[in-house]
């Protein structure tokens, strides 16, 4: 199972905290809360995951968020430094709303602690529909905060990217009400009209760990304190092979067929 994990897993999603400050209408958090600011991944599970990844010399991507706002956590920078120390070859990336970025210095801090890539989405306010005028204002405001000079194409495409030190930064204003995912069918308006026939590659190439150490079928599977319909298993911090055994388990094996 260790060798299978090393061979096939290209992305480990590691959600280190619970809280999200937003409740976008194209996300399950809109109806299923993520309000606990203090809830974070248990220390023994965090250490166990890092030790396991270190053991196989993991060098693929680690995504540092699921349904939380990662930058809301006061321990975020410290934990990223610990990941970088223990799994130095991994590419550390995350998505964020940008709400906790106040200046270019905040991006420099992320670069210094070991984040490699960050994707900022300028979200619409709760229960509002996407509109271009609002998004243009948002992207201009954010660019000003981080001292980025926008070109005509940036405004036209509602996106820009640049390097802050070694940190690759991308900012965009996607209309997720049109282009979003139903998150395992929870967002009814985004459910596809036809059911897919072909198997999905996500259970093969991704391994998804929620804030409490439970493992989900896929990064689109929602989980919070009251909703846990897609939990596959829970990491055993006393077993250094736990993530590998879960990856090779019957539940995930069946999901790949």
Where are these regions (language model features)?
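Short, acidic, Ser/Thr-enriched surface-loop or helix-capping motifs
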Residues: 209-210
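Residues that scaffold the ATP/ADP-binding catalytic core of kinase and kinase-like folds
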Residues: 23, 27, 218, 246
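Conserved glycine-rich "GG(E/T)P / GGGxP" loop and the immediately following alpha-helix
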Residues: 6-185, 198
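C-terminal accessory region of radical SAM enzymes
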Residues: 144-190, 220-257
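Short, small/polar residue-rich loop motifs at catalytic or cofactor-binding pockets
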Residues: 200-203
